[in-house]
Amino acid sequence: MVLDIVIMAAGKGTRMKSARPKVLHALAGRPLLQHVLEMGAALGAHRLITITGHGAELVETTMRANLPEAPLAFVRQEPQLGTGHAVQQAVPVLGDSGTTLILNGDVPLVRAETARALAAACGGEKLALLTVDLLDPSGYGRIVRNGEAVQAIVEHKDATPEQRQIREGYTGMMAVPTAALKRWLANLKNDNAQKEYYLTDIVAMAVADGVAVVATKASSETEVLGVNSPLQLAQLERRFQAQQAEVLMEAGVRLLDPARFDLRGRLSCGRDVAIDVNCVFEGSVELGDDVSIGANCVIRNAKIAAGAVIHPFTHIDGEALGVEVGEGALIGPFARLRPGARLGAEVHIGNFVEVKNSTMAKGAKANHLAYLGDAVVGERVNYGAGSITANYDGANKHRTTIEADVHIGSNCVLVAPVTIGAGATIGGGSTITKNVAPGHLSVARGRQTGIEGWARPQKVVAKKSGKTGG
């Protein structure tokens, strides 16, 4: 059966107090709307039809860029005359049969299992509503049942005292037979105080047509919470992060404090992984067995092999090229690994060392205050404190090659393109502009001069000019 998904995302989000469309505000590093679209794509939807309005062009451009493979379609609601009017805009894009699932673009945590169950409850024949049991249902429409059958949705302001005791609330999401949906939408009226077309009016139409109205319950309130303000967004972020932390810990990951953990992408972990507090993981991150992540690290798009230790305050950002850290490597504290860094087994990168677009073979070390850019570093190289590769000539980047067992003294500059042969030694303070032969000692610095009896200049103190009175 064909499944189309319609996502309402036209609202301005006034309470967000932001120029950005509400559905583009991020939860766990991805726009709210993207969470919903990704879930819909996971269901195998035939079409993902997003109804846009405020900031439509930005919303559409962003989603097409972020989800290039998804079966996206966009329709615009201009002006915005209610939820029923919104779904009416999707009618030309909908098929003639099957099921249409209607979701909200600012409700990002609906699980694929829940949406699948909702569509199954519809079965192309029934009107299925997604409901939830609430501790405080204030503001929600109540689900009034006659036995198991849904009889009506009663808004909070219209509910009787008895109906207000009902804890089952309507989430605003439903699954509808597509052919019936088109017919009911065509008959919507706006004879109400707001002069708007309400999607919920199709419930009465279904009952009048003898179509069964059923309900499927969400697993938790968190799953169906929407976002209308920065406070609600922050609260939902913490709920979502707590859920992700729980999943990881149930899989054996040791989080020292799950309340101080942020995952803004996808994280896969081997056995006996330990993660200290205030760490942020973005993009796609893989941690091998026995990896230890110290406090206050930020790691994005990286693969960290078994036994590696990432000390506190380390920043690893692979961007599009990624970063790889080999087995047993020691990184940090206060290290920075940038896109294209490929570190072999047992490599040491110490405090205030930056590595970009460079490979370092097994056992190479750069322990203090150094920069390696566009470099190939061989096994067991020792790269001294304060040393840098001068890889950029103002227009192009150039390669530095440091072969195995080279010792680079402190405060050296290697001006690329240049090759340091295997086993060579570079004296501290040298500026190397030519290739160095294997096994050679190369020293390129100004000669030290001593001046006997030299005295430092003394500061000249200006005399203050005085004024005489008369």
Name each model-derived stretch.
Residues M1-S18:
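N-terminal nucleotide-binding beta1-loop-alpha1 segment
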Residues A9, T52, N104, T131-V132:
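Short beta-strand/turn micro-motifs composed of small residues
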Residues A19-H35:
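Short catalytic helix/loop segments, enriched in acidic residues and glycine
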Residues E57, V110-A193, T200, V211:
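Conserved core of the sugar-phosphate nucleotidyltransferase
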Residues N301, G307-G470:
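Glycine-rich hexapeptide-repeat left-handed beta-helix
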